[in-house]
Amino acid sequence: RDRLRSRGLGDVYKRQFLYIEQTEAMAVIDVNTGKSIGKKNQEAHIKKINLEAAKEAARQIRLRNLSGIIMIDFIDMKSKDDEKELLQVMQNYLNGDSKKAVAVDITKLGIMEITRKKEKNPIFRQISIDILK
């Protein structure tokens, strides 16, 4: 399990983390807010954090060469329109990828499903193979 302090979340959002875990079946990214969500404008804060986390998640997907099934557990949003916007924003970030990647949908549990074409092993697998040689 890899905890990554997200960059680019702004001074207001200093305690957000992305937890990234790779298994044989899929990669899972969990967006964790820490204690940064206040009581005022909570939905606006959640939306902003999720949009920034989507940008960093797309970056990490490319850097770590994650592929196959990728699930992202964003912070739950009440608005279906906000979920649709998040899905579209993520697809826009994925469109800049050299490998075909598709933000498929957001499940009833609020988890975004992504597929990304597998061409090489993810970076963690490449490193572990090199160590074993």
Could you say what each language-model-derived stretch is?
Residues 15-133:
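Conserved glycine-centered short motifs in functionally critical loops
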Residues 1-13:
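Single conserved hydrophobic/aromatic residue that forms the stacking wall/gate
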